Amino acid sequence: MGGLDNFCNDPTAAQKIVLAFSITYTPIMIYALKVSRGRLLGLLHILIFLNCSFTFGYMTYVHFHSTHRVALTLGAVVALLWGVYSLTESWKFITSRCRLCCLGRRYILAPAHHVESAAGLHSISASGNRAYAVRKPGLTSVNGTLVPGLRSLVLGGKRAVKRGVVNLVKYGR
């Protein structure tokens, strides 16, 4: 990597710093994906995509000037696979955020899957873009979460008005 003695005169110093950051912190961010949810998860995917794309580009550039081609090829393949996965997850995150922005100002910081009730916004766990709403006398639950005064249901940034058997507008008001 080099020392600090020739840092100012080295034209590739910025590349080396970014590469050191990518190699050091990308595995930590990948591990943090297991314990993250919501907006933090989306931002982690964006950072991992940027780190993996830089690492992939650097490894393919160095590949042609190195004698350790097998190791660089395997590293580039792993960086490419993680980059593609993080790109798809980042795209899902960005599209759900844009959909929430289109719903209005108060939904900008809302979770992608939530229930709007008389008490405010409640985050719900949804698998994909599906939720199970149960309406009984005096009780409304969405995916096992009790909701007082259900007004609307938002899944993946889209308002679920008439999906499935339940007409949420009818039960909500």
Swiss-Prot record:
Keyword NAD set for record: no
Specify the superkingdom.
Viruses
In which compartments does the protein localize?
A: Virion membrane; Host membrane
Show which residues sit on the Virion surface side of the membrane.
Answer: 1-12, 61-69
| Intravirion compartment spans | 34-39, 91-173
Asked whether the keyword DNA damage is assigned, the reply is no
Question: Per the record, GO CC terms?
Answer: host cell membrane; membrane; viral envelope; virion membrane
Which residues does UniProt assign to the signal peptide? none
Keywords (alphabetical) are:
Disulfide bond, Host membrane, Membrane, Transmembrane, Transmembrane helix, Viral envelope protein, Virion
Q: How does it sit in the membrane?
A: Multi-pass membrane protein
Which InterPro entries would you find in this protein's record? Answer: Arteri_GP5 (IPR001332)
* Chain ranges passing through the membrane: 13-33, 40-60, 70-90
Assembly, in brief, is:
Heterodimer with glycoprotein 5; disulfide-linked. This heterodimerization is required for transport to the Golgi complex.
The similarity annotation says: Belongs to the arteriviridae membrane protein family.
Q: What does this protein do?
A: Major envelope protein.
Q: What is this protein called?
A: Membrane protein
> Which species expresses this protein natively?
Porcine reproductive and respiratory syndrome virus (isolate Pig/United States/SD 01-08/2001)
Please name the taxonomic classification of the source.
Viruses, Riboviria, Orthornavirae, Pisuviricota, Pisoniviricetes
